[in-house]
């Protein structure tokens, strides 16, 4: 039986029996040809030359003056309690006893998740002489609320403290040779008819709002401090290039733009490796993907363990209305194990009573290990330059606290 076979480089191979030919036209199927990307450039530079040009153009490329940044900040945490044991418990407060503590530990969740989202205007300057400022627009949070049993135990402990501990007492906490002062709040009831009591409550509320705002500034500052051109950045691939090896530069596509792609790995004690994406026209780093390849921090001493084993993420820099690049997006993942295995004493003292100042004492040994993972994300919707005078006139005053939600189901920044 005779066959006729047709084969060509962009045609699907086809075969026919000669006896089946009954037409002068033979239909063949074309096969798509996959071609690799081809980049043509007149800049044949080594990675060392590219890095050198990045350094040379830092001041020209990146915004270091006063800016107003319209931001969305998200921070999600997962905490797993690997071990939590309290023994050798002694207490001079009758209601605070070992059985109550055992009930408390038995009802504590082994895993807790939380989330906090904030929309704000964040004001900054590269110069550390000027404190960063924030105007919070709104904020929301979610976390595991206590169960009924745990809430009941906490209420019982709170009542016992209010009954036995005096509002004008001061407190010391000791762990072996270590010691310090301890503030215990909430022992005073707020009397709505007492002007002084109300004033203290209002001052406390203002402080909480101020502390929340400062906490958000601290989180955002930490992200900006990772920018590769910041003085104390841990991502010092560019400021200290002698500490790193750089791969041969590849041409790649990022979004719709051509970029140089360079891999960076540490030579010695440096802890981070990274992928750098560099604009070939102005030699600006427009994206960094980084990851730690060694523990960021690890200590085990005198019953205290801290092991920061994870820090990775990415940072994207973009041009907004001006001609310079600013941070437009960042995500940093963080993981650490913390352990504490030491004796603790909580001592109540009061100088307004006759006799000895020591009133009550609670002592125990705590053995605790937790694993905490957090993911912090910032999206900058807009960034614009402002004058030093405008920056100085901005008041650091916050009236916003996060609203609680059982879960986040909506797009928080849609109307922003």
What are the roles of these predicted feature ranges?
Residues 2-16:
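A short, solvent-exposed loop/turn motif at the edges and junctions
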Residues 9-11, 21, 31-33, 43-45, ...:
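Solvent-exposed coil/turn segments that connect beta secondary-structure elements
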Residues 14, 23-231, 237, 255, ...:
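Surface-exposed, low-complexity/disordered segments
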Residues 238-243:
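Short, surface-exposed beta-strand/turn modules with glycine/proline-rich turns
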Residues 247-299, 305-319:
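Feature captures eukaryotic membrane-trafficking machinery centered on endolysosomal pathways
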